Amino acid sequence: MTDNTRLRIAMQKSGRLSDDSRELLARCGIKINLHTQRLIAMAENMPIDILRVRDDDIPCLVMDGVVDLGIIGENVLEEELLNRRAQGEDPRYFTLRRLDFGGCRLSLATPVDEAWDGPLSLNGKRIATSYPHLLKRYLDQKGISFKSCLLNGSVEVAPRAGLADAICDLVSTGATLEANGLREVEVIYRSKACLIQRDGEMEESKQQLIDKLLTRIQGVIQARESKYIMMHAPTERLDEVIALLPGAERPTILPLAGDQQRVAMHMVSSETLFWETMEKLKALGASSILVLPIEKMME
């Protein structure tokens, strides 16, 4: 029998988002063994169950109220949303927040030896894709008629196999397209992972747990986007040094023993510190510059 007091979260069992989703939950302090083949894994330290399923099942589980939360790519979520609307349904869910992983783009690609004069080049053509609804919405907005060839995998081989004239598929580096004699010609949708919640009334204990989880996720993402910086900085150029390092709060300034011309400065910077920034700090007279990763962060 299902325990309705436990928060149920669906995530991808294997694939593009699986490792990052697992890492996010671990960094949020959820102790769970996700290295087994079991469909449902129970957290050791929180009333949370993790359902490990196919990515295209996750929006369905959330929209149908089977699970409380889902970690899913926006591309899969939007495709299912359009699919249900096309069938006359009114799917309900909440997007709690966008996450900082799973970035990709859904793009049109054509054979490298064919001319490209914009989307109109696809008028009347056959296009292979795993995202027929996103493709249709985009080309309908352009007033372009086309024939759809639905494939659930290996979309990039369709033109070479004579199944389609072009493809619409996810792209990260473009290496797979190049290996199959294709080139990316148009981006139709940009996607990241997101956290979604089912519609409907939520038990107070579950909602409190969701709020706690959101706070921790915010802390994890902030920590990944921030660095803890320590340095010795000249007193007379302190404002210039601080201007190079935008942060959530003002830095901590400490005196240096026996040195009236410099101070020790500690701060959390909200931007990734590149070598160019460190070189600018050094040019302003800063020294002993240390840039450290942050494990956890809460403002």
UniProtKB/Swiss-Prot annotation:
Record's keyword annotation contains Magnesium: yes
Enzyme class: transferase
Catalytic activity, EC: 2.4.2.17
Pathway listed: Amino-acid biosynthesis; L-histidine biosynthesis; L-histidine from 5-phospho-alpha-D-ribose 1-diphosphate: step 1/9
Pfam family, one: HisG_C
Essential cofactor(s): Mg(2+)
Compartments (UniProt record): Cytoplasm
UniProt keyword annotation of Metal-binding present: yes
Principal place of residence: cytoplasm
One GO CC annotation: cytoplasm
UniProtKB keywords: Amino-acid biosynthesis, ATP-binding, Cytoplasm, Glycosyltransferase, Histidine biosynthesis, Magnesium, Metal-binding, Nucleotide-binding, Transferase
Reported regulation of activity: Feedback inhibited by histidine.
Single GO molecular function: ATP phosphoribosyltransferase activity
Catalysed reaction equations from the record: 1-(5-phospho-beta-D-ribosyl)-ATP + diphosphate = 5-phospho-alpha-D-ribose 1-diphosphate + ATP
GO biological process: L-histidine biosynthetic process
Function noted in UniProt: Catalyzes the condensation of ATP and 5-phosphoribose 1-diphosphate to form N'-(5'-phosphoribosyl)-ATP (PR-ATP). Has a crucial role in the pathway because the rate of histidine biosynthesis seems to be controlled primarily by regulation of HisG enzymatic activity.
Protein family according to the UniProt entry: Belongs to the ATP phosphoribosyltransferase family. Long subfamily.
NCBIfam families reported in the protein's UniProt record: hisG, HisG_C-term
Subunit structure: Equilibrium between an active dimeric form, an inactive hexameric form and higher aggregates. Interconversion between the various forms is largely reversible and is influenced by the natural substrates and inhibitors of the enzyme.
Protein's name according to its UniProt entry: ATP phosphoribosyltransferase
Organism name: Shigella flexneri
High-level lineage: Bacteria, Pseudomonadati, Pseudomonadota, Gammaproteobacteria, Enterobacterales
Gene for this chain: hisG
